[in-house]
């Protein structure tokens, strides 16, 4: 912060302080009191009468006495953060008719009396996070008809009374995450007809009653992640017509009923990662056309059927990493014209169809890392005009002529540093080389007899000065044995019938500008098939008239 701005802020803060005394251990501002003295043992009696918000942080008092704030009826917000509160006297919050926001977080109380909040008829937000609550009485919220936000995260709740939320017809947010809930009464949430966000993450739920969400027609967000759910009733989401975001990750779901998402026409985000899914039923996403983000990572999918994503024309992010996918149909992504990010890493893909990404003109990021790909078909990225982030590492790339298309594409459209850990697995003389750092001339293949433009003579059958034509007209299939010298500058590819391809990289000899006319040179070449001696002779002759 600039010195002048700091001085201005400090001056305004000092002006905000009241003229009259502030309670010991507290700081007072215009309408707010902040108390953080560890020696503060009780709620101060001399809180300024104009105070609307009071916040206690890491104070030492353990008991909140009866009508502790009785002298401050204008309070609208009371907060206790990481205090040692463990007991509330009867009517502890009495005399606060205007209180709208009450928070007690990080304390150690185990239970609450039924009438503890009975006078807080204006309360709109109640936060009781990360305490030691083990149970809640059924009538705890009976006087809180105005409540819109209720947070009970991080307690020790194992069960909830079925009529606990009966009076909360205006509640919009309910957070029950990080408790020990193992089951839910089917009618527990039925009174919450205005609820928009429900968080049940990190509990011990193993299943859900069929109608548990049956009355939540206004729900927009549902968090069910990090439980032990293994199976979902087919109609469990059937009344959630307004649902936009659904978290189901980190459960034990093994299969999904075909109709499970049939009513979720407004769903924009769905997370199914870290489950045990092996198959996705055809038509599973037929009724979720608004999906923008879909995550299926860390499952056990071996294939994805054609048409699985046929109706997801608005999808922008699709995550299929960390599965066991071995094959993808050519048209699996055909309808995903809005797709921007596609994650296919950490699968068992060995080959990709040339048209696999054909309609993905808006694709910007594609991960193919950690598969079993050896090459990519020519033209596979020709219609991906916005693709500049391509992850390829962790594949056994064969750096021959079949990789030339990918190599040239990388040189033209991506930063070489993005794939600096993408290595050649073969041929032997290029093993371990960084793919983007290669020279295109190194990406060569042996040619067939019909397209060979030179003859090979073995050392014992040739004479020095034999003629060679190094013009190779076309690259073709691999041979069975590839011989090379230790430096990798001379490579000879042979099959059982004959040697079909030769690549020689000549370096000038000391004191010479290069291999001279009418000269020859020998190399000892080795491979897993054996060894041989190669002689190359060059004889220059005058051209005819």
Curated annotation (Swiss-Prot):
The keyword Glycoprotein applies. Residues 22-49 form the LRRNT domain. The keyword Signal applies. Residues 395-447 form the LRRCT domain. GO terms for molecular function: enzyme regulator activity. InterPro entries: Cys-rich_flank_reg_C, Leu-rich_rpt, Leu-rich_rpt_typical-subtyp, LRR_dom_sf, LRRNT. Whether or not any Cys residues participate in intrachain bonds is unknown, but they do not form interchain disulfide bonds with the 50 kDa catalytic subunit. Residues 1-21 form the signal peptide. It comes from the Eukaryota. SMART domains: LRR_BAC (SM00364), LRR_TYP (SM00369), LRRCT (SM00082), LRRNT (SM00013). It is found in: Secreted. Its main location: secreted. LRR repeats lie at residues 98-119, 122-143, 146-167, 170-191, 194-215, 218-239, 242-263, 266-287, 290-311, 314-335, 338-359, 362-383. Tetramer of two catalytic chains and two glycosylated inactive chains. This is Carboxypeptidase N subunit 2. It comes from Homo sapiens (Human). The lineage of its organism: Eukaryota, Metazoa, Chordata, Craniata, Vertebrata. The gene is CPN2.
